[in-house]
Amino acid sequence: MTIRPFARADLSATVATLARAFDQDPVMMWIFPDERMRRRRLPSFFASSLRGIPRAGGAEVAVLGGRVLGAAVWLAPGAWRPPLWRQVVALPGVALRLGSRLPAASTTYGALLRVHPERPHWYLSGIGTDPPMQGTGVGSDLLRSRLVRCDADRLPAYLESSNERNVPFYERHGFKVVGELSIPGGGPTLWLMWRDPADGPDQEVAQ
């Protein structure tokens, strides 16, 4: 298995893998409670996200025999908050993809932005492994690949876990829970996790 930077030629396979990986994700189930709608909308959701990634920091894919087994979507320091003009330009397409679920998605996005740390960091906006390959080390290899860079650059990393069962996985890679967030309106709870670079001092996370 090889971990390498995401390329445009990987788009279709990576979108399909992430859509399968996030089909039962609590946040995605909250935004798209209808299973058929969720399976229709997730591919376009991830396609839109990935198209903007190369200029926003980079994604990495785990590949074996030409098959994308998993992907990690990262945003470089400062890139987690898109400029207002980009949000305005993207709004019509976002509204089209989300339809009647736009309010739920907007509530979720707004809640996440309000608690996002301001201190420079790499942001893991999503990581997913094709369900048949989960538990085989794909996710760990993807995570380690970028965390090595974080350590070399002396930069922290941040993520939100929407599943409490995944918290120990991230803790094994040096992340610590620094807070919990319940999405307003009856949405799921997310665990906010921070990782200082290896061998670096523990520092208070600046919100």
Regions picked out by a protein language model, each given a short descriptive name:
Residues V68, V73-G128, Q134, P184-P188:
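Conserved acyl-donor/pantetheine-binding loop and adjacent beta-alpha core of acyl/acetyltransferases
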Residues D25-A47:
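Conserved GNAT-fold acetyl-CoA-binding loop/helix
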Residues T129, G135-V148, R172:
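Conserved acetyl-CoA-binding loop-helix of GNAT-fold acetyltransferases
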Residues T2-A16, R20, Q24:
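A short beta-loop-alpha structural element at the N-terminal edge
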Residues P120-W122, R149-S162:
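Conserved GNAT acetyl-CoA-binding A-motif
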Residues R41-V61, P117-Y123:
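A short helix-loop-beta-strand connector motif used in the catalytic cores of GNAT acetyltransferases and
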Residues S140, A152-R154, N163-E180, G186-G187:
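Conserved active-site alpha-helix within GNAT-family acetyltransferase domains
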Residues L155, L159-E164, I183-Q207:
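C-terminal "cap" of GNAT-fold acetyltransferases
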